[in-house]
Amino acid sequence: MATLLHIDSSVFPSAASASRAVAETFRTAWQEQHPDGTVIYRDLSANPVPHITADAHTAGFADPATHTPGQAAAFAEREKLIAELEQADAVLIGAPMYNYAIPSTLKAWLDNVILMGRTAANENSKVTGTPVTVIASRGGSYAPGTPREPYEYVQNYLKAVLSDALGLELEFIVPELTMAAHNPAMSELVPLAEASRAKAHEDAAAKAKELADRFAA
């Protein structure tokens, strides 16, 4: 049975979070195709993973037999997160834009799972080629040609780490202009925001079914 690793990082509940809501659409469509499959779920806002410490970092480059008690404890946490990623047939990540970047909790998760010689810089990595769908929501628009394009650090960063470093098969779904309904200065953009959100839900369902069919074959 196929395994989906689902990561949420928004600080808001689904009713107030585009990334969570669209990710739910993806997950629901996936589970309809794989009712007996496994979903590994991590809510990084409710249960943050540890930030990388010196012990966690150095343990990744040392023989486990030589680990200090501090290194062993810190690396055990990394090992758990890496094992979940290696187990996944597909990955789903909710990545809202906060102050032009990803939430710090998501950065902490990435710092834990990127391990040189295992998940990165390893031609035999178990995660290479794993499809990852990122719901990259944002309050405005940072699309090519817009005034804020130079401030788009979410997709650019995640491409570097997920695709270039980890070798995952990356696709973005981008619900944008999510603040239009709450900011009077953006009121004229509400129709565009609604269209963007509707398309994001449609794309999420379609992508989930596409991947589910791939692993059912």
UniProtKB/Swiss-Prot annotation:
Domain of life: Bacteria
InterPro entries, sorted: Flavodoxin_fold, Flavoprotein-like_sf, FMN-dep_NADH:Q_OxRdtase_AzoR1, NADH:quinone_OxRdtase_FMN_depd
Molecular function terms from GO: electron transfer activity; FMN binding; oxidoreductase activity, acting on NAD(P)H as acceptor; oxidoreductase activity, acting on NAD(P)H, quinone or similar compound as acceptor
Manner of cofactor binding, per the entry note: Binds 1 FMN per subunit.
EC annotation from Swiss-Prot or TrEMBL: 1.6.5.-, 1.7.1.17
Record-linked Pfam families: Flavodoxin_2
Binding site for FMN: 10, 17-19, 137-140
SUBUNIT field: Homodimer.
Task of the protein: Quinone reductase that provides resistance to thiol-specific stress caused by electrophilic quinones.
Protein name per Swiss-Prot or TrEMBL: FMN-dependent NADH:quinone oxidoreductase
